[in-house]
Amino acid sequence: MPNLYSNNDDGYITSSTVATWAGARDDTTGGSINTSSTFSSIFTAVSKYASRGGGSTYRVVRSFMYFDTSSITGTVSAATIKIRGGSFNDGSIIAVKSTAFGGDGGTSLSTSDFDAITGYSTGSSLAGNATDYSNTITSTSWSTSGYNDLTGTSDLRTDMQNDNVVIICLMDYTNDYLNSAVGSTTTLNYGGYYANYTGTSRDPYIEYTIAATGYANNVNGVAAANIGKINGVATANIEKVNGI
């Protein structure tokens, strides 16, 4: 199965640290950005801090990346977003469609991309609003020593085969995506690697499968999946056998 690796411009945006959950989660300009790290312990993160003199402050971190899908032809039948984890695994994660990087990968990631999520709704859960690109991983099921698999949705597969660029935001699921304020003073985070890591051994990538084409029926009782050629002709080049 072929792989698509994230562009080196990937990175993470941290919200401003403010006195309300809504102010952090729905930050429209972001507080800071990092596109040069090879790894971050706050690949996805939500935090609640105790403030001096009483009260609390909040912070949210989201990661963004994009993939060049212009070379894909045919139907994408399966896709898995693979993120190399590390350090922390007490958070949660989901991949959603994003309009960061100018919407086409032609613009550098900026703090204003913090809420560049398709279907983003200020003050509301993203459930039913965002275009989900993966399943969710929650709690300690996140590996800190290997790759984590996020199974791609039909929306991801469709965009991979139809669009030249696929842009992804990876965000905390339990609190950020669902818009549920962090209750206790804590940081809930997953650690993860970016494309700036030397080589590709820990880079984010999408593993995908292109559906087979050509003759797709049984021949003399043998399943098409087990047939490579008929009379020396590759099945990918056959539409009919004896007119069928």
Question: What function would you assign to each model-found segment?
Answer:
Residues 54-56, 89-92, 102-105, 173-189, ...:
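Short, surface-exposed beta-strand/loop "edge" segments at domain boundaries and coil↔beta transitions
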